[in-house]
A protein has these predicted regions:
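Extracellular receptor-binding modules and their adjoining Ser/Thr/Gly/Asp/Asn-rich linkers
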Residues: 2-72, 104-130
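Terminal beta-strand-rich extracellular "head" domains
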Residues: 71-101
Length: 130
């Protein structure tokens, strides 16, 4: 067997093993992801997986509804927000400690400036793991 044939056989075997061990329920895979922004007075979803809708509840505050609910609210999420201006002002994606909600059906996220005021962003990227 040539080296090329051996490598091809090994690659096929690795692919088979990975495929049998990692499926859609694997905890390392994102259950939800979305890239959206507030542009022209409306929420625009650029791309998404398992997202039914994104609703702007107030300036800089959004509710992301899942198309298929999580089993519970014991998931983790991470998000990044882009500055809507070109002046070096940063945006931070956060959850409010007092009234931000995280349920099996949706998660509330907020976009804030470094001056701690809520503000919209033209691009927010959210990923949810469970």
């Amino acid at each position: 067997m040539s080296l090329a044939s051996s490598i091809a056989a090994l690659a096929a075997r690795i692919g088979f093993e990975v495929k049998t061990k990692i499926d859609a329920t694997h905890p390392g895979l994102a259950r939800v992801w979305v890239s959206f922004g507030y542009v022209g007075g409306q929420v625009v979803i650029a791309s998404a997986r398992n997202v039914a809708s994104v609703v702007r509840t107030a300036a800089g505050r959004y509710r992301v509804h899942f198309a298929v609910a999580m089993p519970d609210a014991n998931y983790c999420w991470t998000a990044l927000a882009r500055s809507s201006t070109n002046s070096g002002q940063q945006r931070v994606a956060v959850i409010r400690a007092s009234s931000g909600l995280k349920t099996a059906k949706y998660v509330d996220i907020s976009c804030a400036t470094t001056a701690t005021s809520f503000d919209d962003s033209s691009e927010i990227n959210l990923v949810v793991y469970r």
